[in-house]
């Protein structure tokens, strides 16, 4: 009887199936296919422009106040490629897909997915400027609700796509802290059977051991901004009093600079948070 060899397509599909199960964070992100990459002839290359929502102002009264439409975008760059390269024999390809998956594909995809998740979490976490709670301590249920409030304040959609990622130790603490509160019977069963919080406070709770841990620079006090040279629209400011450069990903505020509602422009009662994207001892970008 002729050998029934596993094809590259079968191996790839199995690898993707396993990857989908192991990508705790990436699995919650937008993965809509963009056919710009499928164009024949002129390709878009490694960069994809993502259009941002247009912003307008509201007039009061009957007089027309026409305004220009200025579309803005951000660029998504395919900058990092990762893979697990391995050798296997034609004999391996004659095995059943389940056996081949367990022996070869699954271990390879496990380490690849873990590396991809860690890289992505490190990257995106350093770009996030909204923060609640006390660093280094288990967030309380009230603080988690404050995080949800931050999403509301910046107009994040109120749907089932809101997720919270926690390491197992923190998840265990949350399960213990929430065990006495009212829960939907289906969700509370997950705490006792699986040791994880299901869907609570409008969030889907997910365990993830690759959470990025941020470390501030050695000098985080006494840094002041040069307000004399600052101008509207600046994303880099001169600083003084820094003995070492602030760490990329550190969050800071500026006196009298308040957060505002994105649409009404009415100021919130709290200061706007910013995140360091680049820094030296004399300047800081955000």
Predicted regions and their residues:
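Autoprocessing Asn-cyclization modules and mimics
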Residues: 173-286
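N-terminal "assembly arms/tails" that initiate or stabilize quaternary assembly
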Residues: 1-74
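Short, well-ordered loop/turn elements at secondary-structure boundaries
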Residues: 44-45, 158-160, 247-248, 270
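Long, contiguous amphipathic alpha-helices that act as assembly "spine/axial" helices in icosahedral shell
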Residues: 50, 76-143, 152-170, 192-207
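Threonine/glycine-rich low-complexity segments that form extended coil/beta-edge repetitive scaffolds
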Residues: 66-72, 76-78, 235, 252
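Short alpha-helical segments and helix-capping/turn motifs at coil-helix boundaries
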Residues: 30-37, 143-151
